[in-house]
Design a protein with these regions (language model features):
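Intrinsically disordered, low-complexity regulatory segments
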Residues: 1-210, 283, 527
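Basic, low-complexity terminal or inter-domain segments flanking catalytic cores
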Residues: 2-5, 15-16, 25, 132, ...
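Alpha-helical scaffold elements adjacent to nucleotide-binding pockets in ATP/GTP-utilizing enzyme cores
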Residues: 16-20, 98, 102, 121-129, ...
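Short, polar/flexible loop-turn hinges at active-site or ligand-entry regions and domain interfaces
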Residues: 87, 113-115, 133-138, 198-206, ...
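C-terminal or mid-to-C-terminal helical accessory/interaction module adjacent to the motor/catalytic core
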Residues: 186-268
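Core structural elements
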Residues: 212-222, 240, 270-272, 320-332, ...
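Metal- or metallocofactor-binding catalytic centers and their adjacent structured scaffolds
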Residues: 291-326
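Short helix-coil junctions and helix-kink-helix linkers
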Residues: 332-344, 548-558
Length: 898
């Protein structure tokens, strides 16, 4: 029997660690959290809680028969104020029994959860459930919390002798043999170092996680019911989620309010007597900066300079360096993965998690390819620096290696104990692992590898030339820049599109443009001069990358939570994506407006950022967690009471001050139905006037242009129609053309253009394109509708029936929930192979039986991952949020209030 037990969060991580520890250790997984707040109640001891009504008939009496006094209301002076009530997560009894069984036979138990607040909290809860000597773990949690298992409720209803599914039947262990170990990378050296210095649970880290959880729970569970009452059920608010929505909504308001200003630029093509001709731009007038506001001014300047003598006024040459970027932090990884690979933050973090926990590399087995991916530090270990400095001269030449390592400064509140996101072994190049990784994993690993190697290379060097040319009273300027040494750019190229570049990747004016040799005083010939009209542009809408950047710069939330925050506001239909940029839906704007008006201080950017700083202070042991929550509560409860009385209701109708167009007597009220927002008469039902507020085709896009949607198939305009499931876009060519497009909350789903592929159609020879249909993406002929060739896009997972085809996502005309098409997964060789499954396949092997893939499916108790193989009972519940970052709290909708 193994002498020591090691517990981690996931089977993949357990598999990777197990091969490094040897036979003296058994490594098992807790499958994420084992304890959490209850799903259907707030689960926190709050100051306004009323005494619970006692069950049973008559008064509760003491031993001598005297009547017991009712429990006193909870006040802010209560010693256990804001205490969370933790439950064992439903279905975890089997996991806990298994861990207890192994722990009882081990001489030591090591909790090896991730090295952050969430990992520390998981470890603290594991220590509790392993060591508390009660059958159903009605237990004292870390720092005085009380944890009460949902299983206890089941036990009270169970018949005598009947086995309870989640009963904790294995005895607890001695808490003295429980230790905590942490490591930033899953490598033999890092693991050995961690086990040489085990420690106890860090209560400061646990307190910081607990404080964040309590704050998020208070906001979600207290404000969300307000939205149910005032707007509609199922909506949610979140401490950080709502601030992110506010940023997007306020940016949209800026765009609408933006007034375009005309301005002109003037460009001259000049001949210096030797090639090439070069361009100069109007720069100054009589030595002062100049603005050209209109065509009249531009024409006057043109008339003056056409008659002027063009002469070189000055020539300046200098060498300019572009320094390499630092290795990735979490947020920078999310930004770069979106800009370069178009990966969402959620997708990036899911892929990075797999690279961190371990992937199969043939005979090597499971290998962790990157360090821990949730970090705000750019620190790199000395061993990693030595290794990359060995690689650079061997692979690229000694001219690319700086004399000493490049060191980068992390932001002030970064955890220097963590490292940047980097390869665990930089000598394991992307080419070495290419055959073992799918495209998505490979591209992300390649990006991380390239960024890390580039960070330790020499700067790129450019020869920059600036020529000022006089033309009478006016000065024109030409700038050219030619790369002299590529440096780190040998490895880490700039994205082709300027819009996809980070702030420190912006090209200088004239980069890549050569200028002829000229001397001061040299006369030039004017070859051509042209004016160009421009208009100022409104601030751009946020992309995932720029939203993450804004949140980080404002100190809102933490990079580890950005993926879940962005996913939530999209899933709640508060925002939609239009060509990769976030636009608030009508619902999102209304919700943001209500919350910001009633809770302006709670959802203020600076206030939210200050709360994040306080969480850091709790982690450092500088601030008691209850004090931070109490200060928030005292401000919040005042706003909550005021909002309960004063927040306007879209259910009741919000007066617009406009008379009804039909009866002329009633006032138009803005209201909401299941189809979206509309205007209705206050005299309803006597007057049934209704006006849909869904944006129409003539809606202003915010940049002065009118949006008109055209049919993909016939080219005719699309019109908004209403059907049994709400509004949608339909072709005006109906019935000859029956094309439709879905709308969300009255706003159109962005049209996604066809993406050309480097492939020819087997029927007609035209190019193939990736198309977007009602059932998802597919490949079709660019010659449509003349050629109707199509084929599905495969998922890279072999069909288990024929072992030749691959899974594809399909849809049928039959309806799923809420009128949606029914989605299923089948073999790409259909009709030769008719295998189908309603469950989504996932390219991960079963940790129990080794089956080549698992599936995600919905059960009565929630979504689970399970083995597809008949006879294998492996199953893993999918928590509502990633184990490392809980989604912000919102109550589960229950029966409507009477």
């Amino acid at each position: 029997m193994a002498r020591s037990l090691v517990i981690v969060e996931s089977p993949a991580k357990a598999k990777t660690i197990n091969k490094y520890l040897g036979r003296d250790y058994t490594v098992k997984a807790s499958i994420g959290h084992v304890m959490d707040l209850p799903k259907k109640t707030i689960g926190i001891r709050l100051p306004d809680d009323e005494p619970k009504k006692r069950k049973g008939k008559g008064k509760k009496r003491g031993k001598a028969g005297e009547e017991k006094a009712p429990r006193k209301p909870v006040t802010l002076d209560d010693a256990k104020i804001f205490e969370p009530v933790l439950h064992i997560i439903s279905g975890k009894g089997k996991v806990i029994n298994d861990l207890r069984k192994s722990a009882n036979s081990a001489e030591a138990v090591y909790l090896a959860g991730d090295p952050d607040r969430e990992g520390e909290a998981i470890s603290a809860h594991l220590a509790l459930v392993l060591s508390k000597p009660t059958k159903y773990v009605e237990a004292e949690a870390p720092n005085g919390q009380k944890g009460k298992a949902e299983e206890e409720k089941e036990s009270s209803k169970a018949k005598p002798g009947k086995k309870i599914k989640d009963e904790i039947s294995i005895p607890p262990i001695d808490p003295k043999k429980i230790f905590r170990v942490t490591f930033n990378e899953i490598t033999p050296k890092a693991i050995r170092a961690a086990f040489e210095k085990p420690r106890q649970i860090d209560t400061n880290l646990v307190d910081a996680q607990q404080a964040r959880r309590v704050l998020d729970r208070i906001v979600g569970y207290k404000i969300s019911p307000l939205l149910w009452d005032k707007v509609r059920r199922g909506l949610s608010a979140g401490r950080v989620q709502t601030v992110a929505l506010r940023l997007i909504a306020e940016r949209e308001q800026e765009i609408r309010a933006f007034v375009h200003q005309e301005y002109w630029t003037i460009h001259a093509m000049l001949d210096a007597g030797e090639p090439p001709l070069f361009e100069a731009r109007l720069f100054k007038h009589q030595g002062e900066d100049i603005q050209v506001p209109n065509q009249e001014t531009a024409d006057k300047i043109l008339a003056a300079v056409r008659q002027a003598k063009w002469q070189v006024a000055s020539v300046a040459q200098k060498e300019k360096k572009r320094n390499p970027p630092p290795p990735f932090t979490t947020s920078k990884l999310q930004q770069a993965a979106y800009n370069r690979l178009r990966y969402t933050a959620k997708r990036t973090m899911a892929l990075a998690q797999r690279l961190y926990e371990g992937v199969e590399l043939g005979e090597e087995g499971s290998v962790a390819l990157i360090t821990y991916m949730r970090t705000d530090s750019v620190h790199v270990s000395n061993d990693a620096l030595a290794q990359v400095r060995e690689l650079i001269p061997e692979r690229f030449g000694s001219s690319y290696l700086p004399a000493k390592p490049n060191y980068y400064k992390s932001k002030k509140d970064a955890q220097e104990a963590h490292e940047a996101v980097r390869p665990t072994d930089v000598l394991r190049t992307p080419e070495d692992v290419r055959k073992y990784l799918d495209d998505n994993l490979f591209k992300l690993y390649q990006l991380i590898w390239q960024r890390f190697v580039a960070s330790q290379m020499l700067p790129a060097i450019f020869d920059q030339t600036t020529i000022d040319i006089s033309a009478g009273e006016y000065t024109f300027r030409a700038t050219g820049s030619v790369q002299k040494f590529d440096g780190y750019m040998r490895v880490y190229q700039l994205p082709a599109a300027a819009a996809d570049r980070e702030e420190d990747e912006k090209e200088d004016e004239g980069e890549g443009k050569a200028l002829p040799r000229v001397t001061e005083g040299q006369t030039l010939r004017l070859d051509q001069i042209r004016p160009e009209q421009h208009f100022t542009e409104p601030p751009p809408r946020y992309t995932e990358a720029t939203l993450v950047k804004e949140l980080e710069e404002d100190g809102i939330g933490r990079p580890s939570t950005y993926a879940s925050i962005i996913s939530t506001i999209v899933e709640r239909e508060y925002v939609k994506k239009d060509q990769g940029r976030f636009t608030p839906t009508m619902l999102g704007e209304r919700v943001s407006g209500l919350l910001v008006k009633s809770f302006d201080d709670v959802f203020d950017l600076k206030f939210t950022a200050r709360l994040e700083e306080e969480l850091d202070e709790i982690e450092e042991g500088k601030l008691p967690w209850r004090q931070a929550v109490r200060e928030f509560w005292e401000k919040f409860v005042v706003d909550l009471a005021k909002a309960d009385d004063e927040m306007v209701s879209y259910k009741a109708g919000i007066p617009t001050g406009k008379k009804c167009e039909k009866c002329g007597q009633g006032e138009l009220l803005e209201r909401i139905s299941r189809h979206g927002f509309f205007l209705g008469c206050s005299r309803y039902p006597d007057c049934d006037f209704i006006q849909d507020l869904s944006p129409d085709l003539g809606e202003d896009s915010g940049n002065g242009e009118t949006k008109v949607e055209y049919c993909d198939n016939c080219g005719k305009e699309m019109a908004i129609k209403r059907g049994r499931f709400g509004t949608f876009l339909a072709c005006t060519g109906y019935p000859d053309c029956k094309t439709t497009r879905r709308l969300v909350q009255g706003t159109r789903i962005a049209h996604q253009p066809d993406e050309p592929l480097d492939e020819k159609c087997t029927l007609c020879g035209n190019g193939l394109v990736k198309k977007h249909g009602r059932f998802g993406e597919f490949i079709g002929c660019s010659g449509y509708p003349k050629c109707k060739y199509t084929r599905p896009i495969t998922m890279g997972i072999k069909c288990p029936k024929c072992n030749e085809g691959e899974f594809v996502r399909r849809g049928s005309a039959g309806k799923g929930g809420r009128g949606r098409p029914r989605i299923f997964y089948g073999c790409s060789r259909y009709p030769d192979c008719d295998f189908t499954t309603p469950h989504m396949p996932i390219a991960e092997s079963c940790p129990k039986c080794g089956a080549p893939f698992i599936v995600e499916k919905r059960t009565k108790t929630g979504n689970v991952r399970a083995c597809f193989k008949e006879g294998c009972d492996w199953e893993q519940s999918i928590p509502e949020a990633q184990p490392q970052a809980h989604a912000e709290e919102a109550p589960v909708p229950v029966a409507a209030k009477s």
